[in-house]
Amino acid sequence: MGIAKMTNKLSLLLQKPYVHHQLSVAELVEKVLHRNEGRLTHTGAVAVTTGKYTGRSPKDKYIVEEPSTKQNIDWGTVNQPMAPETFQKLYDKVLDYLMKKDELFVFKGFAGADPKARLPIQVVNEFAWHNLFVHQLFIRPSAEELADHEPQFTVICAPNFKADPAVDGTRSEAFIIISFEQRTVLIGGTEYAGEMKKSIFSVMNYLLPEQGILPMHCSANVGQEGDVALFFGLSGTGKTTLSTDPKRRLIGDDEHGWSSRGIFNIEGGCYAKCINLSREKEPQIFDAIGFGAVLENVILHDATRVPDYDDGTLTENTRAAYPLQAIKNIVDPSVAGHPSTIVFLTADAFGVLPPISKLTREQAMYHFLSGYTSKLAGTERGVTEPEATFSTCFGAPFLPRPAVEYAEMLGQKIAEHNVRVFLVNTGWTGGPYGVGSRMKLAYTRAMVQAAVEGELDNVETVQDPIFGLAIPAHVPGVPDDVLRPQNTWADKQAYEQKAKELAEKFRANFQKFAHIDPSIEKLGGPLV
């Protein structure tokens, strides 16, 4: 089936009388309740469950192997190839399945807040709550924009269609397939809404570099003087917490592009983790979960319909989706100038990386490519040994192109705009996990504030003997002793041993970048 035939079949489907186009939030909430897809919370949010898939399914994600894009994709475990004929057969089956439904829901909008770089998208949903989710997460068009809207990419999401691996060429019943030639994302077998969001992010990660725009998995905010800061970091490093600052306005919490004009948010909403959420800890997120927000896998108290954010029975990965406009302190539209500061966040459970260090351009590229943090493996079974995790460019699951392309773009932009870059360790101090303690949030906030406000630009620094990083000798509001990891360990020999152990893990991980300019590792990596 060629692209024309596929397009015809889709337009035939979208003309059916039972297809609802561009419903409002209130209409979608009514549909969700009427169809028994979810329940209303005491604030008017919609609470839903996603069945057995409570997170992304990276092993079920494919990119169609097509002549026009084949040479540009970094094929492997992240970007698994699928034959065009396999995709087309499955596409046909999914559309036949959707033709038999009583109701379908279509949203048209945009990915990318910069009008010159945005991608017009449409999303076709089997579930009303999924359509509400994309309405809140992507950029909603004005009436004029809707009248001229020509979708450049279509997401078709049919969670109740289960693939048959023996027949359909998939690994399981679930599948997330991107075809760049057919400008289509096909999702089935999973109800987890994050797949729709991250599929479009993967699409933008492929398309934006063609326009000289760097796509980034980061949060971004702007100060009173218009100074922009970016925060990169893997899950659990403090990206959302540290970029939410009463003195700075939020541009976005997760996905951004950096063009020759500056920074823009790719999305129109937030998809915030909400396990253990409280108004005291995260007032902006807590208060944003109002009418029309979507709560995924959050348990409600039966009588009051009040969410119990501390209950991780279904998953620790509970989520809230809401539009950016639900937050008071935002930049609207979500565009800003070039960043003056970039912060890489890591939670080092080995307790050896400095709490803050200034990076050279080569070190910035090295640590961007490394994407290091650590996770605590199996603590519930009494295994307390931390595990080093490396996720290239702080977003490996969403990068269709070779990582080096993104790193080189970052390096060029840092040099061009004279951006200061810091590595901030929000993890352990005074010893590894189990011996030391977690870095105090008040100290981390003080360090980030000093970095972003330019207070560390001319400060005296000391070189870390193992990682070669420039550690500020003084940071306002932080004891000097805390700044140098070896000073916080009682056993200096144990510190050196552990630091060398982590340095070796960095080296081993970096071997996969054999084709990169050797000066990046030589000037950017550990000294030992």
From Swiss-Prot:
Q: Which reaction does it catalyse?
A: oxaloacetate + ATP = phosphoenolpyruvate + ADP + CO2
- A molecular function GO annotation: ATP binding
This entry's comment on the bound cofactor is: Binds 1 Mn(2+) ion per subunit.
Q: Which UniProt keywords apply?
A: ATP-binding, Cytoplasm, Decarboxylase, Gluconeogenesis, Lyase, Manganese, Metal-binding, Nucleotide-binding
Gene3D superfamilies tied to this protein: 3.90.228.20, Phosphoenolpyruvate Carboxykinase, domain 1 (3.40.449.10), Phosphoenolpyruvate Carboxykinase, domain 2 (2.170.8.10)
Enzyme Commission numbers on file:
4.1.1.49
User: What cofactors does the UniProt entry give for this protein?
Assistant: Mn(2+)
Annotated residues that bind substrate are located at 56, 192, 198, 319
Protein name listed in UniProt:
Phosphoenolpyruvate carboxykinase (ATP)
Role, per record: Involved in the gluconeogenesis. Catalyzes the conversion of oxaloacetate (OAA) to phosphoenolpyruvate (PEP) through direct phosphoryl transfer between the nucleoside triphosphate and OAA.
Per the record, its GO cellular-component terms are: cytosol
Species name: Geobacillus thermodenitrificans (strain NG80-2)
Instruction: Tell whether Transferase is among the UniProt keywords.
Output: no
Superkingdom field: Bacteria
Q: Can the keyword Nucleus be found in this entry's annotation?
A: no
Cystines in this chain? none
The similarity annotation says: Belongs to the phosphoenolpyruvate carboxykinase (ATP) family.
The record's annotation in HAMAP family points to: PEPCK_ATP (MF_00453)
Q: Name one GO biological process term.
A: gluconeogenesis
Top-rank EC class of the record's enzyme:
lyase
Q: Which CDD domains match?
A: PEPCK_ATP
Q: Where in the cell is it found?
A: Cytoplasm
Residues noted as binding Mn(2+) in the record, renumbered to the chain: 198, 217, 254
